[in-house]
Design a protein with these regions (language model features):
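Short, well-structured N-terminal submotif of metal-dependent ribonuclease cores
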Residues: 1-42, 54, 58-66, 142-144
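Acidic, PIN/NYN-like endoribonuclease modules and their adjacent C-terminal/linker elements
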Residues: 2, 96, 108-144
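Phosphate- and divalent-cation-binding pockets in alpha/beta enzyme and binding domains
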Residues: 22, 46, 89, 127-128
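Structured helix-beta-strand junction loops
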Residues: 33-34, 75, 114, 132
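Short, conserved alpha-helical segments within structured domains
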Residues: 40-44, 64, 86-89, 107
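Active-site-proximal, substrate-binding regions of enzyme catalytic domains
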Residues: 48-78, 88
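Active-site neighborhoods of divalent-metal-dependent phosphate/nucleic-acid chemistry enzymes
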Residues: 77-121
Length: 144
């Protein structure tokens, strides 16, 4: 089963966030299912930004951010290069979801293109998708 994961969910694997335990349980479940994990290249930049923000907030030290980034780059998550097709689909999704920015829509468009599940730590995004009839989007809070 193909799965697209977003940066918010991934950051929970490194930083102490309210949904860190669920993120670990989800990753264990996906490994057991032998899921293929994917993310748009944007994912790396969003994770880097999250680590930097954690440094700025004093949650982690700069050296930890560097170590986390190295560990992140070693994860078995396929980075899917940008394409015109994905960008156009992301624009359509951003418009459909009423988003002012199209970052989240990149993950949605990729999941749609790969016929994959989308797992996110963004409850509002997932609820918005479900209200649009999308049954392949899941919030980390669904993990027990």
């Amino acid at each position: 089963m193909a799965v697209v994961i977003d940066a918010n969910l991934t950051l929970a694997l490194f930083l102490r966030l309210p949904y860190t335990e669920q993120a670990y349980r989800l990753m264990d479940h996906l490994r057991e299912r032998r899921s293929t994990l994917s993310a748009p290249v944007l994912w790396e930049y969003e994770c880097l930004s999250g680590f930097h923000r954690a440094v700025q907030l004093g949650a982690i030290r700069p050296q930890q951010a560097a170590e986390f980034m190295n560990d992140l780059l070693a994860l078995e998550i396929e980075r899917v290069d940008p394409s015109v097709e994905n960008h156009l689909a992301a624009l359509r999704w951003a418009e459909r979801l009423g988003q002012s920015k199209a970052y989240d829509a990149q993950y949605v468009a990729l999941a749609e293109r790969l016929s994959a599940e989308l797992w996110s730590a963004d409850e509002r995004l997932v609820n918005n998708l479900k209200s649009q009839g999308v049954d392949w989007a899941h919030w980390i809070g669904e993990v027990s």
